C-alpha cells in the first residue's frame, strides 16, 4: 500500500502535495525542472470565459514573511486554455484541478460546463473570492447565500467534482463552508489570500497600483490552520489545505488540522523544486513521528 496515497472525490493522489493555483501557471515552465508526474496533483492557473490582461503594475510587493499580489486573474481565456494549455498537461498522469473564476454567475457556469472537455481535468476549483459585478463588487465568497447559489449553479453543469476555494476575508468561515457543502460541493480548498496593503514611504501611496493585494506566504499559515480546524470540527467534507506551506512539518500540521491534501503556493517562487522536495522528505518525517500512513493519520484525527 502507498502510505502517502489520498483518495478524495475525482482525485486519486499518489501523495498529498500539489502546487497551488496562480503559482504554477499551466505547468510548462516547471516541467523543465522536474517530472510533473512526481506531484500529487496540479492546481492550474485561473481561467475566465474571455482573456484578461489583469491589473496595472506594480501588482506584486514583498512583505515580511510573505508577499502581496493583485495580478487580477490574468489569463488567455477558456478557448485558448482548452486548445493550447491543457493538451500539454494531458501527457502526464498527474490529475489536473482547473481553477475557474468569473465576474458573474454566468461566467462561472460557462467555463465549468466546458473545462471538463480536457481529459486531464479531474476536478474544478471554484475561485469564489472574485468580486460579483452584478452585486456591487462584493466577493461571491463572503455571503453564504450567494456562495450557495453559485455552487449549486456550477454543480448543475460540471462534469467533474467541484471544490470551492474559500476566502478568509469573512467573519464566519464555518457558515460559508456549510452553505457550500449544502449546495452539493464535493470538497473545499482553503484558504485563499488575506487582504493586505503596503505603503511606499517616499510616495506616501500604496505600493500596489490597485491599492490592496492578497497576502500569501508563511505569514498567513496560522490563520489557515485555524480555519481548517474550525471547518473540520463541523464537517467531514474533503479539504485541500493551503496558506504558507514551506516545510514538511507544515504539510503535516495542515493534515493534522483537518486537511486531506496540501497545496504549496508562494514557496514555488522562492524554490521551484519545493514540491518534489517536500514529497521526498515526507516519508522520513512520518517515520520520525510514528505515522505509518496518511490513512492512519486521518483515522487518528477522526477518533480524537
UniProtKB/Swiss-Prot annotation:
Catalyzed reactions: (S)-dihydroorotate + NAD(+) = orotate + NADH + H(+)
Active-site residues, as the UniProt record annotates them: 130 (nucleophile)
Gene Ontology biological process terms from the UniProt entry: 'de novo' pyrimidine nucleobase biosynthetic process; 'de novo' UMP biosynthetic process
EC annotation from Swiss-Prot or TrEMBL: 1.3.1.14
Domain of life assignment: Bacteria
Coiled-coil intervals: none
GO cellular component terms attached to this protein's record: cytoplasm
Keywords assigned: Cytoplasm, Flavoprotein, FMN, NAD, Oxidoreductase, Pyrimidine biosynthesis
Cofactor: FMN
HAMAP family noted in UniProt: DHO_dh_type1
Function: Catalyzes the conversion of dihydroorotate to orotate with NAD(+) as electron acceptor.
Protein name: Dihydroorotate dehydrogenase B (NAD(+)), catalytic subunit
Species: Listeria monocytogenes serotype 4b (strain F2365)
Amino acid at each position: 500500500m502507498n502510505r502517502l496515497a489520498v483518495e478524495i472525490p475525482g482525485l486519486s493522489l499518489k501523495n498529498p502535495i500539489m502546487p497551488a493555483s496562480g503559482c504554477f501557471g499551466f505547468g510548462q515552465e516547471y516541467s523543465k525542472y522536474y517530472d510533473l508526474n512526481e506531484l500529487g496533483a496540479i492546481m492550474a492557473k485561473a481561467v475566465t470565459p474571455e482573456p484578461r490582461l489583469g491589473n496595472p503594475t506594480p501588482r506584486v510587493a514583498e512583505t515580511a514573511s510573505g508577499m502581496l499580489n493583485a495580478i487580477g486573474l490574468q489569463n488567455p481565456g477558456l478557448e485558448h486554455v482548452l486548445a493550447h494549455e491543457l493538451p500539454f498537461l494531458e501527457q502526464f498522469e498527474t490529475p489536473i484541478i482547473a481553477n475557474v473564476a468569473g465576474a458573474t454567475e454566468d461566467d462561472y457556469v460557462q467555463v465549468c460546463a466546458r473545462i471538463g472537455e480536457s481529459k486531464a481535468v479531474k476536478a474544478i476549483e471554484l475561485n469564489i473570492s472574485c468580486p460579483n459585478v452584478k452585486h456591487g463588487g462584493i466577493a461571491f465568497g463572503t455571503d453564504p447565500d450567494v456562495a450557495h447559489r453559485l455552487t449549486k449553479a456550477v454543480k448543475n453543469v460540471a462534469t467533474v467534482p467541484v471544490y470551492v476555494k474559500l476566502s478568509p476575508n469573512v467573519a464566519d468561515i464555518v457558515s460559508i463552508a456549510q452553505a457550500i457543502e449544502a449546495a452539493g460541493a464535493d470538497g473545499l480548498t482553503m484558504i485563499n489570500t488575506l487582504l493586505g496593503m503596503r505603503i511606499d514611504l517616499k510616495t506616501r501611496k500604496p505600493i500596489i497600483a490597485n491599492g490592496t493585494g492578497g497576502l500569501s506566504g508563511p505569514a498567513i499559515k496560522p490563520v489557515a490552520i485555524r480555519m481548517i480546524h474550525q471547518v473540520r470540527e463541523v464537517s467531514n467534507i474533503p479539504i485541500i489545505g493551503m496558506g504558507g506551506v514551506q516545510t514538511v512539518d507544515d504539510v503535516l500540521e495542515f493534515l493534522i488540522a483537518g486537511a486531506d491534501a496540501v497545496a504549496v503556493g508562494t514557496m514555488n517562487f522562492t524554490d521551484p523544486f519545493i514540491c518534489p522536495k517536500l514529497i521526498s522528505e515526507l516519508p522520513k518525517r512520518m517515520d520520525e513521528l510514528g505515522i505509518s500512513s496518511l490513512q492512519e493519520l486521518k483515522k487518528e484525527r477522526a477518533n480524537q
